[in-house]
Amino acid sequence: MAVITDSLNAKTVLDLIGEERTVVVRRDKEWKPGELVEFYNELGKVIQQNDKVTGTIGNGELVKVRQNGLFAGKEDGELEWHSAGMNRTGHDDIVAMYMHQTAESGGDTYFTDHQRAWDDLDEETKNICRSVKSKTVTYTSKMKLEKMHYKNVFSDERTMMEFRDIDGKTSFEKQTPRKDLVTNHPINNKEGLYYPWSVIRGFTGLDRDQQHSLYYKLKNHTLQEKYIYMHKWERNDIVLSDQHHSLHRRDAYTGDRELWRAGICLR
């Protein structure tokens, strides 16, 4: 994790995201929606949602994350471990989070580092990981939202079916049953685990016992405290979160917490 309090040079920020996975921008100022979008566009291309998606701001680059909105999570506000692209082809490279209004209590966010976790694995496990693909959960449009993992992400089925990637295609139509478990990061080209374990149900090329063993070995390994950063939000904080070698989750909270989310794709 890195903290920036002064220069917002785009190359410096991107390099930090590649090396640290999580970058906190902390300045004593309120950001207007247009200022945020301008800053984010220096880092890449901001994904634009249409007005059918619940809680869009301005031209759709920013989406409100709050109770009864997008990424609302459970009834108490907890949102389990996830990343932007979990079971689809192509996804945001960076998720930008701006804290417009903090919670009365709770709402801390946790970020994992799957690049450092990968570095610490033994070579035998690394070679196994390189040789397999993850088997990911996919859903059909006939299924009810409450039966899907997406129930913690989308507030309603229309938003689920309309949420789009940078190419204009909906996230729902880009689902895939297989994903690489090991990827090279687009910023620093280093290997790391692409491991959104909540939507993974096994691995290709391994028998059932081997799949079970590898799944829990990687899950327990990546969730060690030394690979997790906990962020306690202050008003006007920006957190830039890598979506290749990291997951994030949110604690339960009370109060009228409102965060503005944006998805950024590298140019």
Question: Whereabouts are the PLM-identified features?
Answer:
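Non-heme Fe(II) oxygenase catalytic core, chiefly the N-lobe of the double-stranded beta-helix
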Residues: 2-235, 244-267
